[in-house]
């Protein structure tokens, strides 16, 4: 980066340390570490209602109240605030914007008439975001269902990452529906981990059909996949049925 640039860095990420030492530009660090310029305190997890945590920027304090669920979104929120600070926006204004934030296809919660809860996280899927969504699902009460599409563009890491998600999903949900060639690895790993209620389909339409046949009042349903899977096309049908 040029000396006139600004780098916004998660100081809690050990992989970043060597990079920080080489930077000659303006630096804004964020995280839970005492060394962070923008620091967050203890995070309270409110399940489907989101999360909250205090933050400190120099001598200024504020409280973040994310409406989007998932502890994995805390780092994203901190990065978003840090970027706004880098642009000269006041902390209180940056936090206000974030506290009101919603994004289509990103951890959006919908409540159906029969008590079914739909978590629409269809916009995209990386190993970290899928793991975060599954960890949220694991914490919720009720029968937990996940319909997952494959994670694209992972290169040589693809097999390993899909297998890792297979292990995690087996421990996070009661019913698992999978779509996409790479999801065979999730299927096999989930089965190996003892998960019997896992199904792998050639098309997302078939996966949705099976899911709807099994759906009961009070179920919690997570949809997540890469952009190439276009799982958002299933949302209207699901909304009509719940």
Regions found by a protein language model. Name each.
Residues 66:
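Histidine-centered acyl-transfer/condensation active-site motif
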Residues 11-61, 101-106, 110:
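Extended acidic/charged loop-beta regions that coordinate divalent cations
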Residues 8, 54, 145:
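Short, conserved beta-strand segments within well-ordered enzyme catalytic domains
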Residues 23-26, 48, 59-60, 69-72, ...:
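ATP-dependent carboxylate-amine ligase
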Residues 1-22, 152-153, 157-159, 163:
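Flexible active-site lid/hinge loop adjacent to a nucleotide/diphosphate
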């Amino acid at each position: 980066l040029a000396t006139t640039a600004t780098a916004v860095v998660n100081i809690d990420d050990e992989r970043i340390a060597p990079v920080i030492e080489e930077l000659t530009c303006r630096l804004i660090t964020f995280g839970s570490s005492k060394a962070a310029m923008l620091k967050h305190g203890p995070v309270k997890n409110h399940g489907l209602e989101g999360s909250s945590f205090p933050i400190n920027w120099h001598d200024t304090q504020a409280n973040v109240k994310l409406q989007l669920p998932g502890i994995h979104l805390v780092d994203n929120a901190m990065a978003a605030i840090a970027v706004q600070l880098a642009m000269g926006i006041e902390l209180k204004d940056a936090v206000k914007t974030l506290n009101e934030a919603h994004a289509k296809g990103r951890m959006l919660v919908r409540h159906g008439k029969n008590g079914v809860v739909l978590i629409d996280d269809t916009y995209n899927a990386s190993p970290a975001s899928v793991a975060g969504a599954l960890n949220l699902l694991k914490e919720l009460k009720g029968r937990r269902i996940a319909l997952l599409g494959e994670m694209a563009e992972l290169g040589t890491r693809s097999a390993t990452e899909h297998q890792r998600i297979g292990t995690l999903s087996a421990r996070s949900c009661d019913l698992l529906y999978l779509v996409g060639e790479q999801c065979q690895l999730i299927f096999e790993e989930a089965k190996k981990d003892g998960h019997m209620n896992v199904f792998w389909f050639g098309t997302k339409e078939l996966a949705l059909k099976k899911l709807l046949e099994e759906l009961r009042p009070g179920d919690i349903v997570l949809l997540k996949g890469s952009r190439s899977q276009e799982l958002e096309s299933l949302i209207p049908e699901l909304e009509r049925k719940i």
